[in-house]
């Protein structure tokens, strides 16, 4: 085995490690986006629930003001549309997080495969070098002493 092969594998190993680090960062960012989207859904749902309670309060009041009731119903409807939008964003963020997780796992497997291969190649090269040294010593000891040397 040549050291060129192990150097190439080490370069590939560094590249795959870099890819794994990038995939891990993308996964962390995707998880952060999911957490932020979840928090946004909770906030918007609280607002929509407050708008619903306000509208119900207006309906239960002894004096019914249609203008305020219509405005309150419009605000509640807009709030529930915002909830739907935030839930869609959350779903997209969860889908992106799933894709990021799969990409990170793939990058991790690829990096490990190259690392194992590089370890095997280095061991093979080390064994070949030891065998070469041993063969050289055997050859040197096998030459007759005092005779002509090449």
Name each region found by the language model:
Residues 1-150:
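Charge-rich amphipathic alpha-helical interaction elements
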């Amino acid at each position: 085995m040549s050291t060129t092969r192990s150097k190439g594998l080490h370069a590939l190993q560094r590249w795959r490690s870099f890819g794994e680090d990038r995939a891990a960062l993308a996964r962390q960012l995707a998880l952060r986006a999911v957490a932020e989207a979840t928090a946004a859904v909770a906030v918007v749902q609280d607002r929509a629930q407050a708008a619903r309670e306000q509208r119900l309060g207006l309906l239960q009041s002894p004096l019914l003001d249609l203008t305020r009731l219509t405005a309150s119903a419009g605000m509640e409807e807009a709030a529930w549309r915002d909830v739907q939008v935030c839930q869609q964003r959350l779903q997209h963020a969860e889908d992106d997080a799933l894709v990021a997780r799969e990409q990170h796992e793939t990058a991790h497997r690829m990096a490990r495969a190259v690392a194992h291969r590089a370890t095997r190649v280095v061991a093979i090269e080390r064994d070949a070098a030891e065998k070469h040294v041993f063969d050289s010593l055997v050859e040197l000891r096998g030459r007759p002493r005092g005779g002509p040397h090449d």
